[in-house]
């Protein structure tokens, strides 16, 4: 088996190296071209050893020896950054001031509502029932419920011309009769006003002429 390599050279001579049974022999061969060729003779059993000697490997590597770790190209100098520990957030002074201001507003609102309730009940700052120490405690005795009660307005019932037409609780009123008619029959007919007296016979209007125009006395 032969392996030939052609390294570039400017000289016209070439160096031929041959390895036979582990010994290296050099032969100088003059050639007309400028590319010397290295010929290597080896059998199939020693071919691997010869290739390792030519490539620079000092000793063949055993199959059980661990392989060196391979690093991908461009990532050999990659360093894992340290994990940043989460630090507790510090509340700014503005947010703390806002919470304090809102808390003071709520307390002032609560105190003002309490004082107003006591004043409505009939007791002010000079009342014996008013005590600055017991502002947080409100008992029913401190409040005057009759004075706090609001009178609901009374809505008058709408009445008709007869005085009892608009009372829905009166069984004889037209409203109750209308409701009963709708509940029984599903409809209710209102009576139409009559302009003429009921005793007189209604007047009939002729729809067609009674006499013929040919029999008129003018002709």
From Swiss-Prot:
Which residues, renumbered to this chain, carry the PTM Phosphoserine? 59, 65, 127, 131, 139, 141, 152, 192, 195, 212, 216
What is the name of this protein?
Answer: VQ motif-containing protein 19
UniProt gene name: VQ19
Leader sequence range is none
Q: Principal place where this protein is found?
A: nucleus
Q: Does the keyword Nucleus apply?
A: yes
Ranges spanned by the short sequence motif VQ, renumbered to the chain: 47-56
Give a short account of what the protein does: May modulate WRKY transcription factor activities.
Give the organism the record lists: Arabidopsis thaliana (Mouse-ear cress)
């Amino acid at each position: 088996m032969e392996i030939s390599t052609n390294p570039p050279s400017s000289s016209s001579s070439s160096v031929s190296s041959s390895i036979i049974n582990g010994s290296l022999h050099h032969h100088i061969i003059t050639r007309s071209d400028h590319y010397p060729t290295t010929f290597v003779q080896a059998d199939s059993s020693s071919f691997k050893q010869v290739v390792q000697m030519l490539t620079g490997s000092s000793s063949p590597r055993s199959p059980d020896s661990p392989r060196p770790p391979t690093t991908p190209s461009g990532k050999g100098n990659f360093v894992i950054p340290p994990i940043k520990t989460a630090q507790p957030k510090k509340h700014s002074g503005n947010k703390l001031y806002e919470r304090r201001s809102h808390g003071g507003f709520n307390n002032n609102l609560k105190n003002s509502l309490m004082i107003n309730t006591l004043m409505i009940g009939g007791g002010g700052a000079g009342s014996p029932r008013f005590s600055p120490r017991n502002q947080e405690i409100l008992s029913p005795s401190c409040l005057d419920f009759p004075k706090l009660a609001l009178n609901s307005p009374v809505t008058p019932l709408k009445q008709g011309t007869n005085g009892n037409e608009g009372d829905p609780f009166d069984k004889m009123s037209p409203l109750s009769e209308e409701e009963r008619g709708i509940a029984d029959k599903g409809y209710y007919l209102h009576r139409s006003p009559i302009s003429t007296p009921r005793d007189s016979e209604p007047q009939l209007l002729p729809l067609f002429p009674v006499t013929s125009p040919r029999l008129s006395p003018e002709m």
